[in-house]
Amino acid sequence: MATKIELIKELRKSTQASVMDCKQALEKNNDDFEKAVKWLRENGIVKSTKKLNKVASEGIIVLKSNLHKAIMVEINSQTDFVAKNQELKEFSDLMLEKIFEKVNPKTELVEIEKIQINNDEKVSEKLALIASKTDEKIVLRRVVVFETKTNQIFTYLHANKRIGVIIEIQGKLNEDDGKHLAMHIAANSPQFIDQSDVNQTWLQNERNIIRSQAELEVKENPKKAIFLEKTIEGRVNKLLIDTCLINQKYLIDETKTIGQFLKEKQAKVLKFIRYEVGEGIIKETVDFVSEVNAQIKQ
């Protein structure tokens, strides 16, 4: 468990809010990190979700695909140094090679861990061996498999192996267009394909936060009261533009939206997924002095 001081540090790093605001947010929410972030947003201290960069654990994204199938796995380690370890890289390449034909969209991590990859050695056993050599915890965190007989699959893995994307497309895109679309998703982090795909619970939660922020502004300037509902709707619409893929300006050609690009190509995005190393994980931090003292006492 992270200490109160560590939670304040992580909350401040994630939201850019002041130390006192972070302390107050945690106190009002029983040290619940996610609720504290929400409280900061509702009270206008953090205005935009784009500023909420979660503290990431280390690791790599690994990916293998052809036109009709793709698998993406996140492997977590405790340090960036181990994430770049040559043996871990060789293991991940071998693992993908051995498991690619054996997995399907219903495959779970526990099944992958049991697959033999080399001389009767299971994935879990090889990971444990690398972990013992590096003296770090190394785990498979999550996996996703796309598979289709009639549609196209495109992927993108960023050079640093920290971001990966898989898309399933209905229609015909050439290889460059498919890769560029995957790159766009990697760079712009859409959450939904279009408004019909939006999670309504999420949208209502965001609308409530936007309303709280707007009402605070009205308290500061009562003249804004007559524009309250229009302000809220405008901000909700902007949020939908930012988070829905087809509404976003196309990274490769900003004169058109993704929706316009797909219409020109007579193609449709059926689904996509974007992985980023450590997203959603709160990493515990230990200061250098404490770490040295702990080692001395061992």
UniProtKB/Swiss-Prot annotation:
InterPro entries recorded: EF-Ts_dimer_sf, Transl_elong_EFTs/EF1B, Transl_elong_EFTs/EF1B_dimer, Transl_elong_Ts_CS, UBA-like_sf
Primary location group: cytoplasm
CDD domains for the chain: UBA_EF-Ts
GO annotation, biological process: translational elongation
Alphabetical list of Gene3D superfamilies matching this protein: 1.10.286.20, DNA helicase RuvA subunit, C-terminal domain, Elongation factor Ts, dimerisation domain
PROSITE patterns, per the entry: EF_TS_1, EF_TS_2
Residue stretches spanning the membrane: none
Region (Involved in Mg(2+) ion dislocation from EF-Tu): 79-82
The UniProt record lists the keyword Protein biosynthesis: yes
Gene Ontology CC annotation, any one: cytoplasm
Record localization: Cytoplasm
Record has Manganese as a keyword: no
Pfam families: EF_TS (PF00889)
GO molecular function, one term: translation elongation factor activity
Its biological purpose: Associates with the EF-Tu.GDP complex and induces the exchange of GDP to GTP. It remains bound to the aminoacyl-tRNA.EF-Tu.GTP complex up to the GTP hydrolysis stage on the ribosome.
Family as reported in the entry's similarity comment: Belongs to the EF-Ts family.
PANTHER family per the UniProt record, alphabetical: ELONGATION FACTOR TS (PTHR11741), ELONGATION FACTOR TS, MITOCHONDRIAL (PTHR11741:SF0)
Record's protein name: Elongation factor Ts
Upper classification of the organism: Bacteria, Bacillati, Mycoplasmatota, Mycoplasmoidales, Mycoplasmoidaceae
Gene: tsf
